[in-house]
Amino acid sequence: MIRVVRRYEFSAAHVLARSDWSDARNRAVYGKCANPAGHGHNYRIELTLEGVVDAAAALDEIVAKRVLAELDGRFLNQEVAAFARVVPTAENIARHIWDTLADTLSPARLAGVRLVETSNNSVEYFGSEPSP
């Protein structure tokens, strides 16, 4: 089987904090990432596809319209509906990207989403867990 990996980049800000927790608990769990003023990242998405992958231009257009337009340049907690009640951790962002794209790439199949948040932190999601 051949897999194709396509990469995309976006910048976004977020706060890692649960509204049902105290500030002290959020700081204890999320550290400096719980700063109410937020912080930003230059993210890299790596999509792994299997099967027949249509022209890269078509894939790029789908990702641009469905993912990048929603996430790039945004304060995720405040501007993206998916994160109104879900903490926008790297894991949850990767899951959201999967949920957004998984049914739109036929005849190809989305096999994985890798989200690189920093040089030391990345996550991979393979669609095996339901969204929160």
For each predicted feature, which ranges?
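Charge-rich, low-complexity N-terminal segments
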Residues: 1-132
